[in-house]
Amino acid sequence: MPRYLLEHSHTAAECGAVFAAFNAFDSPLRHQPTTASCHYGGHRIWWEVDAATEEEALGRLPRYVAARTTATRVRPTEIP
């Protein structure tokens, strides 16, 4: 199954709306740990998801969040 890195970006003013968007959206990403920089003023969130397509990967996010998110296909890589 392909893996995608979802990178979401928002402003400080949008931060609350981004997290609130998940309350009314059934997503397997809810209540799961991920990496975010909001606490430090960066206002970016990253998720790694397994999905058949980029569209399927973005479909795991509420529309409001997905519209501000890029999906990049990735794979584990060992750095020599």
Question: Language-model features: where?
Answer:
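Conserved, structured core segments of small domains
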Residues: M1-P80
